[in-house]
Amino acid sequence: MSASRIRAKCFRLGQRCHTRFYDVLKKDIDNVRRGFADAFNPRLAKLLSPLSHVDVQRAVRISMSFEVNLGRRRPDCVCIIQTESSGAGKTVCFIVELKSCRFSANIHTPTKYHQFCEGMRQLRDTVALIKETTPTGSDEIMVTPLLVFVSQRGLNLLQVTRLPPKVIHGNLVMLASHLENVAEYTPPIRSVRERRRLCKKKIHVCSLAKKRAKSCHRSALTKFEENAACGVDLPLRRPSLGACGGILQSITGMFSHG
C-alpha cells in the first residue's frame, strides 16, 4: 500500500473516531441534563472537571457545537454550560480539541508529541478567536481549553490536558447562537423506527445467548447419562454461562462507550 493510501486510510479512521465521539458526548450530556443519575459517564467526569455532577444536572442552559468554523481554526467541539449554584451563576465554555490514537499502548511517541504541540497551538488560536467574536455583553464566561487524546477502538480517554482558564465578558446567548450557526456537524437523531430496530437486535442477541446456554446444558446432561451407563459416577457439571455473559457485557460496553 502506498504512503498516500495509508495517509488517506488514517484520515478516514480519525474522522470516524471524531464523529463517534461527538455522538457519545452529546448523548451523555443529554442524559445528564434529563436528570438520569446513572447516566453520568466517567468520560464526562474527566472532561468536565471544573464542574460537578450536580452542576451539570442543574444547568439552565447547555449548548454544544461540533466542527465550529471560526475561520483560521475549526475546533472539534465547543460546549457552553450555564449553571446556578447557591444563587450565583456560573458559565463555562469548553473548547475540546480531539486527537485520535490508533495505537494507545504508549502515549509518549513522536507522533503523539507532534499531535500534542499541534493541539496546543490550535487551542490557543481558538481561545483568541472566540474572544474576538464574542458579542459585547456583561456575562462572565470562563473559557476552558481541553486537549483530549482518545483511542480509536473503544473511545477510551487516554489523556486530558487542560490549559489555564481564561475569563471573558460578553453576551452569552448571542455567543452560543453564533457558534451553533457556524457549526458544520450535527449528530444524527435516531428515529423511533431505528430505536425499535436496535432494541429488537438486542433482544435477538440475548435469545441466541440463552439458546446457546440451553444447548450447553443439554450436552452436559447427555454426557452424564453416557457416563452413568458405563458405570462411571461423575458429578453433573452445570453449563458455563460465559458466552451469555460475554455477549451481555459487550452490549453494555456498546452503550457505555458509544
Swiss-Prot record:
The record's listing under Pfam families reads: Herpes_UL24
What does the record note about the induction of this protein? Expressed late in the infection cycle.
Please list the coiled coil stretches: none
Top-rank taxon of the source lineage equals: Viruses
Tell me, in a sentence or two, what this protein's role is: May participate in nuclear egress of viral particles. Plays a role in the dispersal of several host nucleolar proteins including NCL/nucleolin and NPM1. Since deletion of host NCL/nucleolin negatively impact on nuclear egress, UL24 supposedly acts on this process through its effect on host nucleoli.
The protein's UniProt keywords, in alphabetical order, are:
Host cytoplasm, Host Golgi apparatus, Host nucleus, Late protein, Virion
Stated family: Belongs to the herpesviridae UL24 family.
Q: What is this protein called?
A: Protein UL24 homolog
GO cellular component assignments: host cell Golgi apparatus; host cell nucleolus; virion component
Organism lineage reads as: Viruses, Duplodnaviria, Heunggongvirae, Peploviricota, Herviviricetes
Where can this protein be found? Answer: Virion; Host cytoplasm; Host nucleus, Host nucleolus; Host Golgi apparatus
